[in-house]
Amino acid sequence: IDAAIKPGNSGGPVIVDKQIVGVVMQANSGGRAENLGYFVPPSMIRHVLTDSKDGVHDGFPDLGFRTQTLDSPSAKIAYGLDEDQDGVLVIKVFDDAPAQGILQENDVILSIDEYDIAEDGSIQLSEDILTDYKHAIDLHHPDETVAITFSRNGIVSTTNLPSQRALDSYSLVKSEQFDKTPEYYIYGGILFVPLNMNLIKRWGNDWSRTAPVSLLQARNEWSSPDRRELVVALQVLASDVTLGYHDWRNWIVQYVNDEPVRDFAHFAEMVKNNPAENLVMENKNGYQLVLNHEEAVA
């Protein structure tokens, strides 16, 4: 909306022609636009109120796939679309997700429910409103079914996908969490933490530019049963045990004694139960951090 939103306005009503059309959410404070604000539309308000009726917060659903737009005419031809067909390309279907076994990578989703998807991933929500196609999924509640029409090698099919409660994140970098005690593990004077958005946002409001590139790039990697979470050697406390590594920080641990790290709990277990004289940690580029285990736990 084109309106000045000031601190304290959040949660107040947005009124147009004497009718409440939404709830004030936030202002754009990035400095690139003036008097630009955002509000929660009625459809989302109704969703939250309906969700709260049973006293259990289920949130919004997720079908367990990710897509990219199909703006390229060459890409449309490559995936079997006709000239009058548009949609989004499925690039990832996650394990144990509702879409697994039904959708496949390289399928093209043409519509969700009654909404046709444009090449840029938008849907015509109403006569004067264009929005992202994911909004059509957000209109549902977990455990409801979502009708999806898709094209596979030029053959069009329709299916009903059961929706599930959205997971914390399908990314290796978990989303920001609140009201939860931070996890950490100290070994040999090195502070290890799980990589999540709480950590990345330590670099301030401009974290997308100032946070270490390796941590930012990890946000584009998908989790899997064999690799659910990343572990970061955040800081090295200077000591004889860590001599040679005092300037190492924000270092992602990929392996411990040649075994891939599955998640933070798995990392802590491997370190604690290390049977060898030395413990060798390695990142994806092959750089190694070696500590004498007996000295590290002393």
Predicted regions and their residues:
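Active-site loop architecture of trypsin-fold serine endopeptidases
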Residues: 1-11, 15, 20-46, 115-125
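C-terminal recognition in membrane/secretory proteostasis and scaffolding
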Residues: 13, 47-298
